Amino acid sequence: MLLLASASPARRRLLEQAAIPHRVRVSGVDESTIHDQDPRALVQKLAFAKASAVQSCLDPSVDGGITAVLGCDSVFVFEGEVFGKPADAKEAIDRWQRMAGGSGELLTGHCLVADGLGATMACVSTVVQFAALRLGEIEAYVASGEPLNCAGGFALEGRGGLLIRGLNGCYSNVIGLSLPWLRTALEDHCAG
């Protein structure tokens, strides 16, 4: 069984929809203490920290049946700037005014940690193309509250999906977990 080291409801839903048996345990990692200039390296470091923190606390009497721990972290890169979750509505509106009509890259770091097999890590990238939007559309979306809880300030699987013109890459990666990557990593884990 997989243990998801994440508080993300979207990641949990992806695993449920894919019928992957799992449990959830939040890592408690202070993300503000982990830095890297390269956003690809940053998301992988964060994913590793989350998976490792949870894996190091496994108790066989409670966690029997856990064969691997999965950590993930996502950031959005627009015009060379890394966007995590917006701090507030004003920041979300400002970002959306910049992003409207443009495109950026959603990066998700993945780390699967398994006893005896070490860690399997990757950064999966998806290009997100945004529709041209009027200020009123942006304000209405931000007022919904949805963009305040997502890397980059948008949720593809929610209202934000209406504001996206297209994707180049993995759909589920934009939601926070690349299911194709996970399938391959789990297959490799089982073969190991």
From Swiss-Prot:
Q: Which UniProt keywords apply?
A: Cytoplasm, Hydrolase, Nucleotide metabolism
Signal sequence span is none
From the UniProt record, give one GO term of the biological process aspect: nucleotide metabolic process
Q: Catalytic activity, per the record?
A: a ribonucleoside 5'-triphosphate + H2O = a ribonucleoside 5'-phosphate + diphosphate + H(+); a 2'-deoxyribonucleoside 5'-triphosphate + H2O = a 2'-deoxyribonucleoside 5'-phosphate + diphosphate + H(+)
The record ties this protein, via Pfam families, to: Maf
Name any GO cellular component annotation. cytoplasm
CDD domains attached here?
A: Maf (cd00555)
A single GO molecular function term of this UniProt record: nucleoside triphosphate diphosphatase activity
* SUPFAM superfamilies per the UniProt record, alphabetical: ITPase-like
User: Could you tell me where this protein is found in the cell?
Assistant: Cytoplasm
Q: Where is the active site?
A: 73 (proton acceptor)
Give the EC number(s) listed in the UniProt record. 3.6.1.9
Q: Which residues cross the membrane?
A: none
Q: Which Gene3D superfamilies match?
A: 3.90.950.10
Task: Kindly list the cofactors needed.
Answer: a divalent metal cation
Keyword Cytoplasm present in the record's keywords: the answer is yes
Assigned protein family:
Belongs to the Maf family.
Known role: Nucleoside triphosphate pyrophosphatase. May have a dual role in cell division arrest and in preventing the incorporation of modified nucleotides into cellular nucleic acids.
Listed name of the protein? Nucleoside triphosphate pyrophosphatase
Q: Which organism is it from?
A: Synechococcus sp. (strain CC9902)
